[in-house]
Amino acid sequence: MTMYIGLILVVLATFCQGEVVRECTFKAYLNDYLSDRTYGLLPCRYFEHGVLPKETLVVDISPNDTQGLWDECGKSDEYPCRFRDKLYWKKAYYWREKHGRSPHVPYPYCDDNEGVKPCYYYNKLMRFDQSRSVNFRSDHVWPVCDDINTDFIDEMPKPCQYNNRLYWGAKQYRMHTGKTRKPPRITNIFIRRRQGINGRLSTKPRRFKQWNLN
């Protein structure tokens, strides 16, 4: 009788393999069950046997995962994106779940969990927490520091560049640049140079309301 029960359990385990995720461990993520790079690595086990099918795009993770093992989001197919205790292999699926629509051009180094890096979304940089300093990528140009005269972080939708760093807050920007006074507003020279790119010249100072990185 015991043998029959064991056989039934083995059959059930084989049949249900990969359909239920019981745990998602860092060890399994690094060392076990590598899949096709098209789908990235498969981090989750089904008990001690088998893995999720490689076509899986959404992976449940353990609610007890409190060690922050999934903070690396979207660097490549090796790093899934975490949102509400789920892992998304494709950033398009991740963005669709989080923002209701897929990104036009996803920023390649977007870390929403820690907020230390900006997110490139629809030709704009967006942040999702109160982080004031982020790493700067030299292949992008940051010509405008919007709302630089305000000290309120929530009114700083665009970061300021200084010495290959980006700063969200005006206070942080002034502290790192050594400036004791508030930086001046955008000058007419900058306006003429900016508008001259598009064939328009003007000496009327104005503030840019939209920031396009393209």
Curated annotation (Swiss-Prot):
Glycans are attached at N64. It comes from the Viruses. Keywords: Glycoprotein, Signal. Residues 1-18 form the signal peptide. This is Uncharacterized protein ORF15. It comes from Ostreid herpesvirus 1 (isolate France) (OsHV-1).
